[in-house]
């Protein structure tokens, strides 16, 4: 613990907490200050000046990052018949119906993404208390309730991320790994930023992006100047 604290102090000394860095500077600092012994994830965080209590100011969706996330996604699909075969052919890790519902209700959660065809939502709905709090419940807004299961599986395996503003207007997203080349992290960051900018509600007041930052797992939070994106 003492060693980790020493590493954190050293990392903090390299970052000016009062400064908003350009995206290129921020990415370079994330890589420079990372001290994790594993290939740490790189995440961005947005504090948006929105009121999620208003229906037209709720921000939620999905996108495919240009350079992927660097994370292997375990994809589970609820489908039957031809759609189940499509999902398997596309690379889904788990495909089933009631058998998967029983398994999940029994405590099994070894998957990262859940996709379902519309006709399967009646049985998937039984898992609301399990999947909902973990942000795993299939939803049309994120493209995880669909008849095109092959495309959904391929996108999930190829770098698709989902995002959602919490009650305080915060949005977090994985944009890659510390091992990524800096230019690939910058490209992913800019792609996500474009999505956030376009998601601005017409009724939002004041400065939309109150704060933007980037960090790595166990790393230092670094403020980013939105204008550099």
From Swiss-Prot:
Keyword RNA-binding in record: yes
The family database entries (InterPro entries) matched by this protein are listed as: Ribosom_uL1_bac-type, Ribosomal_uL1, Ribosomal_uL1-like, Ribosomal_uL1/biogenesis, Ribosomal_uL1_3-a/b-sand, Ribosomal_uL1_CS
The GO annotation for biological process reads: regulation of translation; translation
Keywords, A to Z, come to: Repressor, Ribonucleoprotein, Ribosomal protein, RNA-binding, rRNA-binding, Translation regulation, tRNA-binding
> Subunit notes for this chain?
Part of the 50S ribosomal subunit.
Tell whether Zinc-finger is among the UniProt keywords: no
Source species, please?
Streptococcus pyogenes serotype M1
Output the PANTHER family linked to this UniProt entry.
Answer: 54S RIBOSOMAL PROTEIN L1, MITOCHONDRIAL (PTHR36427), LARGE RIBOSOMAL SUBUNIT PROTEIN UL1M (PTHR36427:SF3)
Give the UniProt entry's GO cellular component terms.
large ribosomal subunit
The similarity comment for this entry is: Belongs to the universal ribosomal protein uL1 family.
Q: What is this protein called?
A: Large ribosomal subunit protein uL1
One GO term in the molecular function aspect is:
rRNA binding
Reported function: Binds directly to 23S rRNA. The L1 stalk is quite mobile in the ribosome, and is involved in E site tRNA release.
């Amino acid at each position: 613990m003492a060693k980790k604290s020493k590493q954190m102090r050293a990392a903090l000394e390299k970052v000016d907490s009062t400064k908003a860095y350009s995206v290129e500077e921020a990415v370079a600092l994330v890589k420079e200050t990372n001290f994790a012994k594993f290939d740490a994830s790189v995440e961005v965080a947005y504090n948006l000046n929105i009121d999620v209590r208003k229906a037209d100011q709720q921000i939620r969706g999905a996108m495919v990052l240009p350079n992927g996330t660097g994370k292997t996604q375990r994809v589970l699909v609820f489908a039957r018949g031809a759609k189940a075969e499509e999902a398997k052919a596309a690379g889904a890790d788990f495909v089933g119906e009631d058998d998967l519902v029983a398994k999940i209700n029994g405590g099994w959660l070894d998957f990262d993404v859940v996709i379902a065809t519309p006709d399967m939502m009646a049985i998937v709905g039984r898992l609301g208390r399990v999947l909902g709090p973990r942000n795993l419940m299939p939803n049309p807004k994120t493209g995880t309730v669909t008849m095109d299961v092959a495309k959904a599986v391929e996108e999930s395996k190829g770098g698709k991320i989902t995002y959602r503003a919490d009650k305080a207007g915060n949005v977090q997203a994985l944009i890659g790994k510390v091992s990524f080349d800096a230019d690939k992290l910058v490209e992913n960051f800019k792609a996500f930023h474009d999505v956030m900018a376009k998601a601005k509600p017409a009724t939002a007041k004041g400065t939309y992006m109150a704060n933007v930052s980037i960090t790595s797992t166990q790393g230092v939070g670094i403020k980013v100047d939105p204008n550099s994106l």
